[in-house]
């Protein structure tokens, strides 16, 4: 989040000025209309006495407010704070976003966090104004709206793809959140959504992956192209118009996803501040995997970052200031598969390619050059025991090392450092990309404390400028 205060007076000033930097950081609701909005909503600013503020969309919905049809507050990326924070609340939010509550319930979420369900409920409600069930419900509602308005998928399929347990639950939630039926939402879709409705299950699910602020797509696609492992990934097309495609192993099945590069992916949003999106298309063997697949892409492309906060801090450093000016909104790429990233951080690209050819699972329906899933840790541990690779994959397979979105970063680092032969520099890379830590500096590198808490981003600026090599 930005360094500006977020007390209610400051929040109201952000609403008055339609400041898009606060979109997702908080939401406001108007008691006289029963509607909640993002701070940059272009509608007439309501009177201060009629406004209530909420930390999350789920909290606003839980208080009986409906999403504004003009600014679509549910579509904005949530606060970047929850991806930065390493405490139980941040870990819980990341797990909920990954669909854990939909798959395993609140008890499963609590078990992953090492707390009781009551403790998790209390902590989330205290900080976010909503518990895990409400947060998961808000996410399902948003996913459903996007699918209803931008695809031609049948309503029944959308209900289950969004994570709902029944069509009735889906219909009731849509009415409660949007004051519309699914059919009415589809009829009211924006023009770009209507244009994309030719999509069918066989053609995949087209989605726009929103980001806040400026986004430097080029360096991200450069990295993905440099690292791409044949059979699992490919990058095609000329710079500025490339497409990244890869296979995914998901909780219910498999997927092939494609994300397009958008040159200068910024646009004028509400107010004077830019925002934008990346176009994606997802082919899933089981539509229930949609939420998880989308979250993995968001982590890979670092779409939930707050570039305003990052750039403001780093631009204050004389060495970094010209780099930030040259590449505003530079991201710190993550990964679509944390365990795969850990193995690839240890091996070279040619070795990873060999592992895929020898141990990767062949897709039932290959698509062009995409033919395999990256081998699972248990398969590698059994096939190539001994050495650092064997020790690492065994630790991953036994869950001695956890790299999922809810993993404790310090615990994971300690467990990785305990793997024989795994050096601290490789562990730092895994912590940065697999665990999404924005503040990592490799050992032995003299990095100023003034770059905290965004040292991972600072190093990406140096790498993009050719002043530092990560490996």
List the predicted regions and their residue ranges.
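HhH-family (HhH-GPD) DNA N-glycosylase catalytic core used in base-excision repair
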Residues: 1-471
């Amino acid at each position: 989040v930005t360094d500006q205060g977020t007390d209610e007076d400051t929040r109201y000033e952000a609403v008055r000025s339609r400041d898009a930097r606060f979109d997702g950081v908080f939401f406001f609701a108007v008691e006289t209309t029963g509607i909640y909005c993002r701070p940059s909503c272009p509608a007439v600013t309501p009177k201060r006495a009629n406004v209530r503020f909420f930390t999350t969309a789920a909290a606003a919905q839980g208080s009986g407010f409906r999403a504004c049809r003009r600014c679509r507050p549910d579509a904005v990326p949530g606060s970047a704070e929850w991806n930065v924070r390493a405490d139980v609340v941040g870990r819980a939010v990341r797990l909920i976003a990954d669909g854990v509550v939909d798959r395993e319930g609140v008890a499963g979420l609590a078990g992953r966090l090492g707390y009781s369900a009551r403790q998790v409920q209390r902590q989330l409600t205290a900080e976010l104004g909503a518990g895990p069930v409400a947060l998961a419900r808000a996410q399902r509602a948003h996913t459903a709206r996007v699918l209803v308005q931008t695809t031609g998928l049948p309503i029944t399929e959308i209900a289950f793809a969004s994570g709902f347990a029944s069509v009735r639950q889906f219909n009731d939630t849509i009415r409660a959140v949007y004051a519309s039926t699914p059919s009415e939402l589809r009829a009211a879709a924006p023009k770009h959504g209507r244009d994309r409705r030719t999509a069918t299950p066989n053609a995949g699910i087209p989605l726009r992956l929103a980001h806040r602020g400026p986004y430097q797509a080029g360096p991200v696609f450069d990295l993905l192209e440099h690292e791409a492992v044949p059979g699992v990934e490919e990058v095609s097309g000329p710079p500025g118009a490339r497409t990244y495609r890869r296979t995914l192993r998901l909780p219910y099945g498999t997927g092939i996803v494609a994300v397009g590069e958008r040159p200068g992916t910024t646009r004028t949003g509400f107010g004077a501040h830019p925002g934008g999106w990346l176009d994606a298309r997802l082919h899933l063997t089981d539509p229930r995997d949609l939420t998880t697949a989308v979250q993995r892409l968001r982590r890979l492309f670092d779409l939930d970052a707050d570039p305003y906060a990052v750039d403001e801090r780093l631009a204050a450093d004389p060495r970094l200031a010209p780099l930030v000016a040259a590449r505003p909104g530079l991201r710190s790429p993550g990964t679509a598969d944390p365990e795969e990233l850990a193995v690839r951080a240890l091996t070279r690209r040619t070795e990873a390619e060999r592992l895929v050819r020898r141990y990767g699972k062949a897709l039932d329906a290959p698509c062009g050059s995409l033919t395999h899933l990256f081998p699972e840790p248990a398969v590698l541990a059994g096939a190539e025991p001994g050495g650092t690779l064997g020790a690492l994959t065994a630790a991953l397979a036994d869950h001695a090392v956890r790299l999922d979105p809810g993993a404790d970063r310090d615990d994971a680092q300690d467990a990785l450092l305990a793997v024989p032969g795994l050096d601290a520099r490789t562990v730092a890379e895994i912590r940065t990309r697999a665990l999404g830590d924005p503040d990592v500096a490799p050992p032995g590198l003299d990095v100023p404390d003034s770059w905290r808490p965004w040292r991972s981003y600072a190093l990406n600026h140096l790498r993009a400028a050719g002043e530092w090599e990560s490996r």
